[in-house]
From Swiss-Prot:
Signal peptide, first to last residue: 1-21
Entry text on domains: The presence of a 'disulfide through disulfide knot' structurally defines this protein as a knottin.
Species: Cyriopagopus hainanus (Chinese bird spider)
Protein known as: Mu-theraphotoxin-Hhn2b 3
Cystine residue pairs: C50-C65, C57-C70, C64-C77
Alphabetical list of InterPro entries matching this protein: Huwentoxin-1 (IPR011696), Huwentoxin_CS1 (IPR013140)
A Gene Ontology molecular function term of the record: sodium channel regulator activity
More info: Negative results: has no effect on mammalian SCN3A/SCN1B (Nav1.3/beta-1), SCN4A (Nav1.4), SCN5A/SCN1B (Nav1.5/beta-1), and SCN9A/SCN1B (Nav1.7/beta-1). Has also no effect on sodium subtypes in rat DRG neurons containing Nav1.1/SCN1A, Nav1.6/SCN8A, Nav1.7/SCN9A, Nav1.8/SCN10A and Nav1.9/SCN11A. Klint et al., 2015 worked with a recombinant peptide N-terminally extended by an Ala residue (AECKGFGKSCVPGKNECCSGYACNSRDKWCKVLL).
SUPFAM superfamilies in the record: omega toxin-like (SSF57059)
Modified residues (Leucine amide): L81
């Protein structure tokens, strides 16, 4: 009986701690998001966007994102295998 009461109390305390932590993160989230948006705008002209899976590409131009390669036959980014 004492062990089950202790486990129930410990579970409630753990639930309280998790809820409190997630609530404090939610309050910080808008500020972090805004700061990241403005930081990205500063380097917008310098950063080259890569193309993901299935996007059309030109072989040899290295347009695909990391882990993908432009397939010369189909001319779209595929998963890079074996290298």
């Amino acid at each position: 009986m004492k062990a089950s009461m202790f486990l129930a109390l410990a579970g409630l305390v753990l639930l309280f701690v998790v809820c409190y932590a997630s609530e404090s993160e939610e309050k910080e989230f808008p500020r972090e998001l805004i700061s990241k948006i403005f930081a990205v705008d500063d380097f917008k002209g310098e950063v080259r966007e890569c193309k993901g899976f299935g996007k059309s590409c030109v072989p040899g131009k290295n347009e695909c994102c990391s882990g993908y390669a432009c397939n010369s036959r189909d001319k779209w980014c595929k998963v890079l295998l074996g290298k």
